[in-house]
Swiss-Prot record:
MF terms (GO), sorted A to Z: dynein intermediate chain binding; protein-folding chaperone binding
Name the record gives this protein: Dynein axonemal assembly factor 6
Organism from which the protein derives: Homo sapiens (Human)
Entry function: Plays a role in cytoplasmic pre-assembly of axonemal dynein.
PANTHER family named among the record's database cross-references: DYNEIN AXONEMAL ASSEMBLY FACTOR 6, TWISTER
GO biological process, one term: axonemal dynein complex assembly
Signal peptide positions on this chain: none
InterPro entries: DNAAF6, PIH1D1/2/3_CS-like
């Protein structure tokens, strides 16, 4: 009887010892895992992020994701040259003759008029041999009449281009665009003291036509 009691006590002791060993092993494993997390916290975060990212990617996929990946088209933006960027105005927006004008010039603009003139001979007046009429299409000259009172003819400066007439005196300034192209070298000017008027006659540049030359 005593031997049986001894055997049962020995078995209880062995069971308790084995349970203690298992508990100690579990505790040691848990301690090692906790220590590993303390030493390498980023590994766990990376694994969690990878799982979350994978789930979000899978959830965002739809029927449009089936097939080859789409290639994004690149839009080409035309480059503007530095010269164009530095321009304040477009050359087409600048009025003709603006390069001759001076906005700071305070001289007065004189009275003037531009008229068309024909070269008419006796054959045109009495015989009517040509087909000329009174229209501007049959005129061959432009005449500019400019009022310049109290002006010395020697003080008058004139610059005539194909489409520009530029006149300057100490008191007056005139810059006009001519209605027709003219021959610069054909211009003739004379001052009429009685009327204090300057007349400038210019031959127009026109193609040969039957009305003017036949």
């Amino acid at each position: 009887m005593e031997s049986e009691n001894m055997d049962s006590e020995n078995m209880k002791t062995e069971n308790m010892e084995s349970q203690n060993v298992d508990f100690e092993s579990v505790s040691s494993v848990t301690a090692l895992e906790a220590l590993s997390k303390l030493l390498n916290p980023e590994e766990e975060d990376d694994s969690d992020y990878g799982q979350t990212n994978g789930l979000s990617t899978i959830g965002a996929m739809g029927p449009g994701n089936i097939g080859p990946p789409q290639i994004e088209e690149l839009k080409v933006i035309p480059e503007t040259s530095e010269e164009n960027n530095e321009d304040i105005w477009n050359s087409e927006e600048i009025p003709e003759g603006a390069e001759y004008d001076d906005m700071w010039d305070v001289r007065e603009i004189p009275e003037y008029e531009i008229i068309f003139r024909q070269q008419v001979g006796t054959e045109d007046i009495f015989l009517g041999l040509s087909k000329k009429d009174s229209s501007t299409g049959c005129c061959s000259e432009l005449v500019a009449k400019i009022k310049l009172p109290n002006t010395n003819p020697s003080d008058i400066q004139i610059d005539i281009q194909e489409t520009i007439l530029d006149l300057r005196t100490p008191q007056k300034k005139l810059l006009i665009t001519l209605p027709e192209l003219v021959e610069c070298t054909s211009a003739k000017a004379f001052y009429i003291p009685e009327t204090e008027t300057l007349e400038i006659t210019m031959t127009m540049k026109r193609e040969l036509d039957i009305a003017n030359f036949f």
